[in-house]
């Protein structure tokens, strides 16, 4: 019996809730990833997804960790969506930064990516380990956190909680800097360039992956030292981008308009694409292992 049957009821109820950037952004990352899945990955993901998807794919469930994190039984996951870094250092170090507010080590987005990668990898290599983990949850958490770590302000400064306490105006709307990067840049892009159609935006990013970014894709896929996942690299990239683009010219009270939007949108688009490529590469490395997940 599949271990995630009870969770399916929660999943199917929550995934159809109110739409937000979390759903759009994470849907985009996972939809891009699906286009790069190898055959073994396609088969494994299909086995792990809830049967109620009605033909849908991984992308339909990639916002689930955001939907559940405020529920009492899942509040422990809230710290796994980000990693805070010291003010103005503009760098990331796992041993220094990956902990929760109580200094429990490994409780951050990069630690979570390592953890859920190892869970899936352990079960893929040894079918006896399948019984120890909820592999559907592991897949969905890994897929979601891979998107989170590519959002620059999910590695932002501790002092402003990744831009959450920096109050700005996005055009005529009051917001905070983190929300601008989570929501407003993508929302404005959808309205301005894609007739408010997320599928059209995804198609545009898919075209860039085949053309403008095609020479970069192999390096995006690669992982040093034969690791299955490289979240430390992704977090280091993100805090560098946060300093160069997110925080720059975005002090409290600033009105952010066309200049900020047009110069930051390419960064957001590329991070969505990199997140998709790297999620696919990670899952391909995991599910290429023997034996397969035959016990599911």
Curated annotation (Swiss-Prot):
Its EC number is 3.1.30.1. Substrate binds at residues 21-26, 66-72, 81-84, 91-96, 115, 133. A divalent metal cation 1 binds at residues 66, 81, 144, 148. Its cofactor is Zn(2+). GO terms for molecular function: endonuclease activity; metal ion binding; nucleic acid binding; RNA endonuclease activity; single-stranded DNA endodeoxyribonuclease activity; T/G mismatch-specific endonuclease activity. Pfam families: S1-P1_nuclease. Optimum pH is 8 with RNA and ssDNA as substrates. SUPFAM superfamilies: Phospholipase C/P1 nuclease (SSF48537). Residues 281-296 form a propeptide. A divalent metal cation 3 binds at residues 21, 26, 148. Residues 144-193 are annotated as: Substrate binding. It catalyses: Endonucleolytic cleavage to 5'-phosphomononucleotide and 5'-phosphooligonucleotide end-products. Residues 1-20 form the signal peptide. The record marks 66, 69 as: Important for catalytic activity. Disulfide bonds join 30-62, 90-243, 98-108, 223-230. It is an enzyme of class 3 (hydrolase). CDD domains: S1-P1_nuclease (cd11010). InterPro entries: PLipase_C/P1_nuclease_dom_sf, S1/P1nuclease. Binds 3 divalent metal cations. Hydrolyzes, with low efficiency, only single-stranded DNA and RNA without apparent specificity for bases. Endonuclease that recognizes and cleaves some mismatches with high efficiency, including heteroduplex double-stranded DNA; mostly efficient on T/G, A/G and G/G mismatches, less efficient for T/T and poorly efficient for C/C, A/A, T/C and A/C. Monomer. This is Endonuclease 5. It comes from Arabidopsis thaliana.
